[in-house]
Structures are given as structure tokens and as C-alpha cells.
Regions:
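Structural recognition of the beta-strand scaffold that forms the well-ordered cores
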Residues: 52-54, 88-92, 137, 237, ...
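A structural motif
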Residues: 86, 233, 374-375
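Hydrophobic core
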Residues: 23, 27-31
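Loop/helix patches that line or flank the sugar-binding groove of alpha-linked glycan CAZymes
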Residues: 266, 278, 324, 336, ...
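Residue-level detector of conserved catalytic or cofactor/ligand-binding positions
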Residues: 485-489
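Active-site-proximal helices and loops of the catalytic beta/alpha 8
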Residues: 125-129, 142-143, 148-168, 224, ...
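Positively charged n-region of N-terminal signal peptides that target proteins for export
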Residues: 2-4, 9-21
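Acidic/aromatic-lined carbohydrate-recognition and catalytic surfaces
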Residues: 35-218, 230, 241-289
Length: 489
């Protein structure tokens, strides 16, 4: 299967970078008048539109030989990240936590010792900003760890309370979580010792849910946000936003609006993207919160629009028409929204599994994503075609495949991960191969960044019937870009 993508700019039409195998950028003079070759370079605006690289910190790069990925390891690999063309990094949680994934903090103001020190984080930020790479942090405030001091103190208080009613004057943390009696038969509620008290934990008993009705909790979270923004963080990825009040979208939207308003009052240029694992209709409602971005789950994963198109289950023009419909709906909810398309992340199977190791489909999918408006997110190792295995989370978070020979920078896999043999070559090998998946991603990102209309523009599809192997998309933003997809065997 061959994919050809042709791009012309109204004010700057010319031959663009040739992409290997299935993404070819060629002159499109027959479609637009006045096309002429040019060598002018398009400068990418320094704004919130970025190409993000998601890093699962413990699995990325080990700087000190302890076989755990760390912050200094990321700093060491910034040249690789910059060379790929990424202009933003999303770090999965780095705060102290008893679990390998760190999605349950015991301290919102620290760095997990396995990842390094606060000085290491500050160095990483400094080096990112030198390269004009923005860094956003994963912020988990649906819940904490059951080992968090707030929770431990509240539980200790309730166990000793007897028949009295809780009093915040005696223990301020008793209102930080969702505590109640008579919940023995209620799903996701867990008993505190042998007392009559229970607490809510939507994900599991080790992650007690915070009470976001509490003004004290919100003040705590505002202080947390201020702390990291003042350190230099460029924004946050908000975990599990639809579980703040499980089953109550309006309340969740209010929380997002409160947090977005507060963060922008501290740092107006900060960027927020939230995880709301839902379909298009629900996402449109959540955009009414005013948040910058929501991850585009309808585009992602095996049954998402990108992979369906890559597998020829829908036509290119159907894909483009879907994109237009989605942008129109989301802009009605939030005219300033920034889409956040992705193919895979730390909770999903990797692209290699979605495409059953079909290299052309994987490249096609990457090319499609890089033609979508907004800020695309690429999961570390996706640019290599790294494998996952089955549905076990640990298998989705395997060590970055830097080299087949030199394993000095390769962390150990999560403890319960299965042994998975990678099908495609390491980063070291793919960097030397002009036809590799890595080079395809790199070229696709370069194409996107050299045509800023793609990320920022208003999109439409021209009228008229097209053959099933052709798709045409018009993007308008300070000029015009016409993208044409042609698929052939």
C-alpha cells in the first residue's frame, strides 16, 4: 500500500521534504494556480501548538546504572528528542509514590527518589527551555496514595472517633476524602480497619478519592499547581478527569474550569490537557470547561479513526470529513480549543499491536496523525514500532529500545512485565536507516512544523465526489494548505 500526501501553501507553494515509503510530499501545481518552486523556510510560531513526546519516566533512560529510568536520563536524551522534532514533553508522574507507575502520590511537592532529585528536575527544565521544548507534568488529583499523610491521619482519627461525628477542627484532613458509614455493599468503598467508616476509591483501595467539594482540598491543589509552575513547569496533564465526580459530567466540567482559571491566573501561557476517556459527544461537553485540550480518544487506538483509515477500513475522504465534523463541534464548545490527537499511550496497546506489526500501516497512521490540527502526542518508542503484549499494563510500559548491544542506558522492565522481543530495530539502528519508522516520524514532524497551518488552521473538505483512494483537505490559516492523500497498492 502506498500513501502519497501532497501539500501546497497559497503564499509558498513548492517542493517539500520527501518522506520515505508511504508519505511523499510532491509538487501539486496541477491543483493550484501560480505554483512555483521556492526555498523559503516557514518559521513555526512560538505558541501553545506543539508536538509532544510522552515519557513513562521509569522506562525511558537510566543515567546512573541502577536500572531505573530517571530525570537525568531524560536530560541526556534531549538531543534525541529535539532532533526528532518534538517541541513538548509530557512526563508521567514523578512525585513520591509506592507504585512503579507513580499515579498515587504520597507527597505533591517532591520527586520520587528513584527518579532523582529536585535539582535534577530543575536541570531538566532548564535544558528543555534552552531547546524551546516545553515540559508538562502529569498531575493526579482525583486521588492520592493510601500512604499519603493526609489519608493516614484522617483514618487514624476516624478509627478512634467512636460514636462521635467527625470534626474538622480536630482533624482537618477528615474532609479531604470521601468518608461515610454504611457503605459495606457499595462498590468501590473500603472499610477503615474495623471501624464503621468507609472511604471511596474508584480505581482500587490503594487510591482513595479526594473530596473536591472541599475548599481546603482545592486550596491545597492550587498551592501544588503554583509550586510547580513557579519551578518552571509549562503546564499539566490532568489524569482521570471524568472520575473527579464519577458519573457527574457537569461537576467534572466545573472542576476543570476552576483549575484552568486558577492555573492561567498564575501563568497565562501554561498549557492544560485532560484525560477524558470518552466519545466525541462527551468530549464536546467537556470542552465547555475552557480547558486548552482533551485527548482525542475517538482518533486513537485500534478502533479509532486513525488506525481504521490506515487499515483501509474507512476511506481517506471519510477520515478528513470526520476531522472537519469534529473540529466544528469542538469549536462550538470552545473556540480556542487545541486538539490533542494520539495513537497510543501508557494505558493502551502500542501501535505495533494495533497494526499487527504492519510497517506501512504504522507509517500511514503516523502520517495521518501529523496532518491533524492541534498538538499531537507520541508515546515514547512509538517512533520505533516498539511492541506491547496483551492487555497487561506493564507490557505497555517496556524499556525504551535504545540499542541492541549497549544496554547501559536501558532500564529494567516493570517487575511483572512479560518478556517481549522487539520486532523492529533499536533507535541506534533506525537513526542510520533512511527508510525506518523513526525516520518517517521525524520527516512527518518536520513537514508538519514547516507548515504551521496544519496545526492551527480551519479545515474543510472541497465539494465533489472523489475516488475511494483519494482524500482532499483544505486547511486555512494565514495562507492555505491543501493536503491530498492517495492510496495505492
Amino acid at each position: 500500500m502506498l500513501l502519497k500526501t501532497k501539500i501546497c501553501r497559497k503564499a509558498d507553494i513548492g517542493m517539500k521534504k520527501r518522506l520515505s515509503l508511504i508519505l511523499c510530499v510532491v509538487l501539486l501545481c496541477q491543483l493550484l494556480s501560480g505554483c512555483g518552486k521556492t526555498t523559503e523556510t516557514v518559521r513555526e510560531p512560538d505558541d501553545a501548538y506543539r508536538c509532544y513526546y510522552e515519557i513513562f519516566v521509569g522506562s525511558f533512560c537510566d543515567s546512573d546504572g541502577d536500572k531505573c529510568g530517571d530525570l537525568s536520563g531524560i536530560t541526556e536524551k534531549l538531543d534525541y528528542i529535539e532532533d526528532m522534532g518534538f517541541t513538548g514533553i509530557w512526563l508521567t508522574p514523578i512525585m513520591p509514590s509506592p507504585t512503579y507507575h507513580k499515579y498515587d502520590a504520597t507527597d505533591y511537592y517532591g520527586i520520587d527518589p528513584s527518579f532523582g532529585t529536585m535539582e535534577d528536575f530543575e536541570t531538566l527544565l532548564k535544558e528543555c527551555h534552552k531547546r524551546n521544548i516545553r515540559l508538562i507534568m502529569d498531575l493526579v488529583f482525583n486521588h492520592t496514595s493510601s500512604s499519603h499523610p493526609w489519608f493516614l491521619e484522617a483514618c487514624d482519627y476516624l478509627e478512634q472517633l467512636g460514636e462521635k461525628e467527625p470534626d474538622e477542627n480536630e482533624c482537618k484532613y477528615v474532609n479531604y476524602y470521601n468518608f461515610a458509614k454504611d457503605q459495606a455493599q457499595t462498590p468501590n468503598w473500603y472499610q477503615i480497619g474495623s471501624s464503621d467508616w468507609y472511604y471511596e476509591g474508584v480505581f482500587w483501595d490503594g487510591m482513595p478519592d479526594l473530596n473536591l467539594n472541599s475548599e481546603a482540598v482545592r486550596e491545597e491543589l492550587e498551592q501544588v499547581a503554583s509550586f510547580w509552575l513557579e519551578k518552571g513547569a509549562d503546564g499539566f496533564r490532568l489524569d482521570a478527569a471524568k472520575e473527579y465526580y464519577t458519573g457527574y459530567a457537569e461537576k467534572n466540567i466545573e472542576v476543570l474550569n476552576w483549575f484552568e482559571t486558577y492555573v492561567k491566573s498564575v501563568k497565562p501561557e501554561a498549557y492544560l490537557v485532560a484525560e477524558v476517556w470518552e466519545g466525541q459527544g462527551v468530549l464536546q461537553e467537556y470542552y465547555k470547561s475552557g480547558i486548552d485540550s482533551l485527548f482525542n480518544f475517538p482518533a486513537s487506538q485500534q478502533d479509532g479513526a486513525i488506525i481504521k483509515t490506515a487499515k483501509a477500513r474507512v476511506t481517506p475522504q471519510q477520515f478528513f470529513s470526520w476531522m472537519v465534523k469534529q473540529q466544528t463541534a469542538d469549536r462550538l464548545a470552545n473556540p480556542d480549543y487545541i486538539d490533542a490527537p494520539f495513537i497510543s499511550n501508557h494505558d493502551t496497546t502500542r501501535i505495533s499491536a494495533q497494526c499487527v506489526n504492519n510497517e506501512e500501516q504504522m507509517k500511514f497512521a503516523a502520517g495521518l496523525m501529523m496532518m491533524m490540527p492541534g498538538s499531537p502526542f507520541v508515546y515514547y518508542g512509538e517512533e520505533l514500532g516498539m511492541k506491547s503484549s496483551g492487555t497487561k499494563d506493564e507490557n505497555k510500559r517496556l524499556p525504551m529500545y535504545w540499542s541492541a548491544q549497549d544496554l547501559s542506558k536501558t532500564p529494567d522492565a516493570p517487575q511483572t512485565a512479560d518478556a517481549v522481543e522487539q520486532k523492529f530495530p533499536s533507535a541506534e539502528e533506525q537513526e542510520k536507516d533512511s527508510g525506518s519508522i523513526l525516520q518517517y516520524y521525524k520527516n512527518a514532524i518536520e513537514l508538519r512544523r514547516s507548515n504551521p497551518e496544519i496545526a492551527r488552521g480551519s479545515i474543510s473538505v472541497p465539494d465533489g465526489e472523489l475516488p475511494e483512494d483519494i482524500g482532499v483537505l483544505l486547511t486555512e490559516w494565514e495562507g492555505k494548505v491543501l493536503s491530498l492523500i492517495h492510496i495505492s497498492e
